[in-house]
Amino acid sequence: MTPGPGGGPGAARPGLAEPTRAVPIDHFSAVHLAAATARTLARRCGLPGALPDRAAVVASELASNIAKHASGGSLYLQRLPHGDGLEIIAADRGPGMRELERCLTDGYTTTNTLGAGLGAIRRIATTLTIRTRAGTGTLVCARLAPPHRTTDAERPVGTLCLPAEGERHCGDAAAVALTDRGLTALAVDGLGHGAEAEEAARAAVRCFHRVPDADLPDLLAAAHRALRHSRGAAIGVLRLRDDTLDYCGVGNVRVALLSADDVGQRLSGQPGVVGWNMPPPQVRRLGAPPGTTAVLHTDGVDQRWSRDPEPFLLRLPPPLLAAALVHGFRRSRDDATVVTVKTPQRPR
């Protein structure tokens, strides 16, 4: 891997092909589960000192807010998409917060409680991103990174990867790499479900991390060789650099480009199965002006999300957009993966 900006010694190590942990907040007992899950994952991510306990506080406060004030809510917890640290995302289906700035004030509460809530989370988290809309709901992303790696929490990248309901194994996977050639993202959908699909997806991720700066067709060719004795997979890879996006995919992995007002272009992979009957991979290049968001997702996310979406969805930052798509458009009987990346705005 060629280190990207800020690379070299201490550069971010490749993320593991681990699915997102989802904790539905359907009862107050789920608050304790969310806190325990955050503490465990923070330790697995290598967060030092008191950070695992602080992660538990963040998860507890977010889960408590959903239990008290919202409906249809869940917490999504995982390693940062790129780099070291933990990401905790809360998503619900309403009613939304009417006075967001007041809710961020320490001690503010709409119930007869201590009101530590969002003010405490803002102090603890390395970064905190919130969007809310009356009648639609609220999305919150809190990222915690070690003191020497705070930039890892600031990258405009989002991923979510969930197994089908009732499955212990996830046949989907995602990975992101930042090299001198740009930001490269991978989404994998191993054929079928269960342990064999999961192994195919993990093999594709391992292959990706060996040479993430290779040409996109070469990445798919390497995955094709690595998956020869597996179930095979649908794979999509994109590379974002300057004002262009290159996409190369085989199978039912889709990409869409979003502006603040509309869904621009949509692409799907070439027919075939990586590891079995892959055609010669073709690169398709799209313009990606500053401020463009690229969405890469497997078929576990219903593609109808991209048909006339509301501006609230289009304008979400990448971590919240990934969560909104999974929370709102996931097919519960299939594994689901979303990767979202955004081109930086040019200084005015």
Regions found by a protein language model. Name each.
Residues 15-47, 251-255:
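Helix-loop-beta hinge of the Bergerat
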